[in-house]
From Swiss-Prot:
Described purpose of this protein according to its UniProt entry: Cell wall formation.
Origin species: Legionella pneumophila (strain Paris)
Entry keyword set: Cell cycle, Cell division, Cell shape, Cell wall biogenesis/degradation, Cytoplasm, FAD, Flavoprotein, NADP, Oxidoreductase, Peptidoglycan synthesis
Active site residues of this protein: R171, S220 (proton donor), E291
This protein's record includes keyword Oxidoreductase: yes
Protein name: UDP-N-acetylenolpyruvoylglucosamine reductase
Length: 303
């Protein structure tokens, strides 16, 4: 890729950049290129100058993603720390950019006396990722609050879209096509600051008690099948504590795979994911569907 046009951009372009530090599993090989946009306009300019066939990967906080050990041979767009504006609007609405962490969004809405966004505190990702997969927990889902979204395509063209243009389901949003979410307008419910902040505190305490928050993990690995829970199925198959290399099925919550003390490779984690799926299928006839996106090249290459 000819990167001479980047001199006109305001963001930061890095080459052969290790991706492990940008993911919550702390694994993954390097990206051929990684771009940190200065703002949405800068992102649009950068994309407009990219070759149309350039492979693109969008990363927020790097949860819900397994980057393989061979890395990614295209360009990674990093939104965390970049697209981070939150604006309080009228009618109990907030405009939030894709790089804002879900936890920050939860606190911002609570401090502005808005409720029904407290659940975001329990999601270890960005709002862009939450929009992409309709992330949720504790009875809340992201798209229950969406009024409109802004998307951008690989030409750098931005447009505003309404929820009815998408098919939104449990941990799935269809209809995005070759576009990415860059911001959203969300409508919440009038609430009480102290009540919401206490709810967030309680939620985080429950999360720390029931999930391996002190270990490298990506969040839930599998979707819950209809009428059941992935964690229950995995535990019922005797898979808690099962390991491949440094990848371990958490003893605390069976739907989490941890990178124990940072010793796992992406290949270890991917192999353990497949092992869990196989054992659950063999013992229960239920196919666990991944929430995690597996990305990149399996083989480590010399660049």
């Amino acid at each position: 890729m000819d990167s001479s046009h980047v001199t006109e951009s305001q963001g930061t372009l890095l080459f052969n950049e290790p991706l492990a530090e940008y993911t919550t599993w702390r694994v993954g090989g390097p990206a051929a290129r990684l771009y940190k946009p200065a703002n949405i306009d800068d992102l649009a300019l950068f994309l407009s100058r990219l070759p149309f066939d350039e492979p693109l990967l969008w990363l927020g906080l790097g949860s819900n993603s397994l980057i393989r050990d061979g890395g990614f041979s295209g360009t990674v767009i990093l939104t965390q720390g970049c697209l981070k504006e939150m604006t309080l609007l009228s009618d109990n609405c907030i405009r939030v950019e894709a790089g804002v962490s879900c936890a920050s969004m939860a606190r911002f809405s609570a401090r502005n006396n808005l409720s029904e966004g407290e659940f975001w505190a329990g999601i270890p990702g960005t709002m862009g990722g939450a929009l992409r997969m309709n992330a949720g927990c504790h009875g809340g889902e992201t798209w229950q609050s969406v009024i409109e979204v802004q998307t951008i395509n690989r030409r750098g063209e931005i447009r505003t879209r309404k929820p009815e243009e998408f098919e939104v389901a449990y941990r799935h949003v269809a209809g995005l096509g070759d576009e990415w979410f860059i911001s959203a307008k969300l409508q919440l419910t009038p609430g009480n600051k102290e009540t919401s902040l206490q709810l967030i505190k309680d939620l985080l305490a429950h999360r720390a008690k029931t999930q391996p928050t002190n270990e490298y993990n990506c969040g839930s690995v599998f979707r819950n099948p209809p009428g059941d829970f992935a964690a229950r199925l995995i535990e019922s198959c005797g898979l808690k504590g099962v390991s491949i290399g440094g990848a371990v099925v958490s003893e605390k919550h069976a739907n989490f795979i941890i990178n124990h003390q940072g010793t796992a490779t992406a290949a270890n984690i991917e192999a353990l994911i497949h092992l869990v799926q196989t054992k659950v299928r063999e013992q229960t006839s239920i196919e666990l569907i991944r929430e995690v996106h597996i990305i990149g090249d399996a083989n480590v290459q010399t660049r």
